A protein has these predicted regions:
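ABC ATPase nucleotide-binding domain helices that frame the ATP-binding cleft
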Residues: 43-46, 142
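Conserved ABC transporter NBD signature motif
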Residues: 58-66
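The feature captures the beta-strand-to-loop junction immediately N-terminal to the Walker
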Residues: 35-37
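Helix-to-loop junction immediately C-terminal to a conserved catalytic motif
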Residues: 50
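Conserved catalytic Walker-motif region of ABC-type ATPase nucleotide-binding domains
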Residues: 6-9
Length: 217
């Protein structure tokens, strides 16, 4: 796990600053939520941390390592999106193992890590199924297991529950909170849902118009 420090971050779209001089420190091992309405810049900031959006100014650190010019695949992050982003042609087991295969980890470690997160996310009974045979909540568990299996330093979650119905959202809040505590990974969670943010977070940053207006517990 890593502390994330962002100093004077700046992002420009079409000559218009959408984030300017943003400063925030995200404690190591915490579940830190960025809460705000659509278009406030929260997903843009998340994508800057991930390396998917360019950084027009400022410095981004994981612990003491400046990551501005490190390509996304080398930042050791896990990501979970609202649309699950799991591979429909792979089984649940192969989806969870995908990142480990990409990293070419030894086979015994691959099997051990895959089984660990299948069990932790309570999806081992679906290991040989394809995603289209799973519910939305089960698919999101697969996405979370795949993100965590590679032992990332940082987990980034972009509106991960927005496509689920009300009951599944409540269930998955509990799952995310419990798993994050158990694994202890630094997690940045983006949502527009205040109730959701209050239910799962160690800290909440309220964002509007590209500015973090308040941080609280």
């Amino acid at each position: 796990m890593s502390e994330i420090k962002i100093i004077n971050a700046k992002k420009i779209y079409h000559d218009i600053p959408v984030i300017e001089n943003l400063n925030v420190t995200i404690p190591k091992g915490s579940l830190f939520t960025i809460l705000g309405p659509s278009g406030c810049g929260k997903t843009t900031l998340l994508r800057m941390i991930a390396g998917f959006n360019s950084i027009e100014g400022g410095e981004f650190y994981f612990d003491d390592t400046k990551i501005n010019n490190i390509e996304p695949s080398k930042r050791n992050i896990g990501m979970v999106f609202q649309n699950y982003a799991i591979f429909p042609h792979l089984t649940v087991r192969d989806n969870v193992a995908f990142g480990l295969k990409q990293k070419k980890v030894p086979k015994d470690e691959l099997v051990q890590q895959t089984n660990k997160y299948l069990e932790l996310m309570q999806i081992n009974q679906y290991a040989d199924r394809k995603p289209d045979k799973l519910s939305g909540g089960q698919q999101q568990r697969v996405a979370l297991a795949r993100a965590l299996a590679v032992n990332p330093s940082v987990l980034l979650m972009d509106e991960p529950l927005s496509n689920l119905d009300a009951k599944l959202r409540l269930d998955m809040r509990q799952v995310i909170r419990e798993i994050q505590h158990e694994v202890g990974i630094t997690t940045v969670y983006v949502t527009h849902d205040q109730e959701e943010a209050m239910a799962i977070s160690d800290q909440i940053a309220v964002m509007k118009d590209g500015v973090i207006q308040q941080i609280g517990r």
